[in-house]
């Protein structure tokens, strides 16, 4: 029987070496098949939505890391696409686990968080499978399930500061105390068998489909068949779960996990009063936006009943008999590699801009240090370049405009007006002439 532990303080898990699990009482060498599928919110088809996912399978097929990140839709009101943040977070995590196989998943998430230095925020869940063992990390309301023979062996719990305000990671959050990878919950389970399934998904699945229904969909796929086509099996499960979640999201009267949560929350509110969320956490400043991964208001779920329209993303991992399924396992791995590379190509412009911002930020920090403390700048050429804004332009800006320009440049937006002006005045023009939101807004304001 599998043993599950869900805990707040994480330890490094165990992996490495040959991977074995039991099948009908016999020890077999295992591999992992994986597949991810998703669809954007119907209103976000043009942008591709704000969810992202990845799956990385080791070359020997024994280990897989599955991950999802759910971009925070509230940032759209600030002109920020959190989908880019989620995609870069997943891409950075995929690269990290491919090169650093001994890191814990909390360390992987920390590395990805430090790499994804562009505006936005996301919830996330990562899981690693090896032999008879799975471990993972959760931040916010993304989650994981482990299923065997129509039974849910493990179900993670979402993290909330208050109703509809999940924990989330962000670069340069708008206000409040940011959540960090150290705030993640961790989970582990041993005793996995061949044909056990691990699901990692955004709340678009778990808000619309009950765990028992997820298990039923998996059971109907009959993983125990003798054809060994585990690549097709994982693809089928991901597709069926996505279809079911999509149907529920559009159903305004269906019984769903989200509808039940809303009923419970309304019972806690003053009679006749509006729904209220708490004031803690990163999205304190975004409370008017709903403080969740999309607009979690009544119009999204039929006045409180039925499903919830959202991005839906699902990654399926299947523990398999490597000797019987090796060809299909390799096909599955190739599909995972292809998806990561497609994401990399899609995000190439955003990542190039992110790298320019990092370089610019290093120069700004050096110039800012000299302006405030009188110490030498970190880079000698920073002061030789022309300022992005003249001192007169900076002095005429109010606090909102200052914060907007700094945020567009990926720079800190906290502090008094005088400090914000010093920070923006220290920004130099990109020596390569690369455009930025700040440069563009300056051109527009001068017309």
Would you name each region that the model predicts?
Residues 1-374, 378, 447:
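PP2C/PPM-type serine/threonine phosphatase catalytic domain
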Residues 379-443:
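Basic helix-extension-helix modules of the SAP/HeH family
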